[in-house]
């Protein structure tokens, strides 16, 4: 059976933190493939300014081209209407594939607020990486609560802490600060060519 990891996000822009998480998940969980899933029309971002799906797709594609086992899917950006995680997992799930949904600690804390969270937990193995804002104690408590309630096993990734966020990168670009230590060079070129994030 193939083992596929799915890492979703707006990737606005993608940065080294995303690539590091994907690389470590692939290595630690012996995954055959990591599928990057740029969000199309995420319900939790409604009303917020988001870079076009086409450009976000190009940024991800340029970032992952030199990584073995990294791929990208257009499923969510080509889907009409809102993009719900459980629908994405249903699309990729089959008898020959075991899915690993890779997400941040904030998702674990709010998982029961997600659309059809029970389906997310039944269709995939939830793989969680730590993010600022939550203590280990809070994370473990929520992990044990969800595992007991839904009869699932949640995987916590062991990662070195990288404090990089797309929000911070956009703010730095707006303030004409350097971001080349956060973002791959081809992405900086795409950002500059398309005049992105000058006004947030």
UniProtKB/Swiss-Prot annotation:
Nucleotidyltransferase in keyword set: yes
UniProt-listed GO biological process terms: NAD biosynthetic process
Gene Ontology MF terms in the entry: ATP binding; nicotinate-nucleotide adenylyltransferase activity
Annotated EC: 2.7.7.18
Enzyme class: transferase
PANTHER family: NICOTINATE-NUCLEOTIDE ADENYLYLTRANSFERASE-RELATED, PHOSPHOPANTETHEINE ADENYLYLTRANSFERASE
Purpose of the protein: Catalyzes the reversible adenylation of nicotinate mononucleotide (NaMN) to nicotinic acid adenine dinucleotide (NaAD).
Entry's family note: Belongs to the NadD family.
Entry-linked HAMAP family: NaMN_adenylyltr
Protein name according to UniProt: Probable nicotinate-nucleotide adenylyltransferase
Lineage: Bacteria, Bacillati, Bacillota, Clostridia, Eubacteriales
């Amino acid at each position: 059976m193939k083992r596929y990891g799915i890492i979703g996000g707006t990737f606005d822009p993608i940065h080294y933190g995303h690539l590091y998480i994907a690389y470590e998940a692939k290595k630690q969980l012996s995954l055959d493939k990591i599928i990057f899933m740029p969000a199309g029309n995420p319900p939790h971002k409604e009303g917020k300014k988001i870079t076009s799906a086409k450009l976000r797709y190009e940024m991800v594609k340029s970032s992952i081209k030199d990584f073995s086992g990294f791929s990208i899917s257009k499923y969510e950006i080509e889907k009409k209407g809102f993009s719900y995680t459980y629908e994405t997992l249903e699309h990729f799930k089959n008898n020959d594939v075991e899915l690993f949904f890779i997400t941040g600690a904030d998702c674990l804390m709010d998982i029961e607020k997600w659309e059809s969270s029970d389906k997310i937990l039944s269709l995939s193995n939830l793989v969680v990486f730590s993010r600022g804002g939550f203590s280990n104690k809070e994370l473990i408590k929520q992990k044990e609560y969800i595992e007991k309630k839904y009869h699932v096993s949640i995987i916590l990734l062991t990662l070195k802490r990288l404090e990089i966020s797309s929000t911070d990168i956009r703010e730095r670009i707006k303030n004409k600060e350097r971001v080349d230590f956060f973002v791959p060079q081809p992405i900086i070129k795409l950002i500059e060519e398309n005049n992105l994030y000058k006004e947030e």
